[in-house]
Amino acid sequence: MSEYGFEDCELCDSPGGEVVWESALCRVVMVADADYPGFCRVIMHRHLGEMTDLPQRERMQVMNVVFAVESAVRSLYRPDKINLASLGNMTPH
């Protein structure tokens, strides 16, 4: 078993970027991508098919993390627009 969960899962085998915050539910990582300054991911620690598979309380916790990350990125980078995306189409997380 890897640090974050299952073997043979790219999101479990490595943190996925520089971990800037972590809880029992998820972690926030900064992704080093010169084309996308401020690119962050909120990554669940357990495998889920969809966000709606989370219990309501955890859904709200995850969304509060997403909103906090958005606020931090807006404050630090002052982008013209924030792009929020759910990209779990390759790896259930």
Q: Predicted segment positions?
A:
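HIT superfamily nucleotide-processing domains
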Residues: 1-93
